[in-house]
Amino acid sequence: MARQCHKWYLKLRFILLTLLALTLGNCLTIVLTETQVSNSISVYGVSGASCGSVINKSTELSANLVCNEHGIIVNASDISIAMNGYSIIGPGIQSTKSGIIVPDVDNVTVYGPGRIVAFQSGIFATGSNKVGVSSIFLDDNRIGVYLTGATNSTLEYNMMRNNELGIAAHSSREVLSNENYFYDNSLAGISFINTGDSTIALNYINGSQNGIFTDPSSFSNDISFNFLRNIIDINSANGLPNDITNNAYEGNYCELSLPSGICRGVTE
């Protein structure tokens, strides 16, 4: 079991680092293109953003977006994206595209109802502070919500289904995953790599290889009162003792954890 978990962890870390490199490369391409092309699309607080829109004020969708490129790129702080019941549909999980990109800005909220489907990352936030995602259906992406270098992110009341990873946080702090629903995300419902001071609470996670995974460099996280039905429900650094990671576990209804003793037992 330990050898199998170690191989799984190495595969997960490779995937996350590869996705980070590819997506950051695309972000750089976007920035360079905007500075060189005078007729790039920018949306200033209007309804009806289109694929590839760079938004500088709060925006509402007025139709579905079917994109062969990135969906929406946020270029300012203190704004919101209202999905208004519409969908952002991408070119597939093998692409390097994201439904919504939030790079190096603060206080951005994406709220539904709405759906983001068929991207490498449904929502990708890098270097940002106070990103909120609520009431969004993220399905058939490689990663539903991908946070890297982010702080104070709040993810609530979302449904994530048929992704490889529902939520993936890399080198982030103060992530809150609260009352989200995860179904059949193949690798993990929630994955933390080098992520700490975060809370995972009141989530329902079903049908993954690992329900919740934290690596050895993820410290001081509070993981409590989640309901899990997965191959491995809670995987803390492939079995590293909790007194080393300083992660706190309370009231999690599940059957199998690494190390043992975290689960309370699933009720029928």
Kindly give the residue locations of the regions a language model identified.
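Short, polar/proline-rich extracytoplasmic segments that appear immediately after membrane translocation
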Residues: 29-47, 248-256
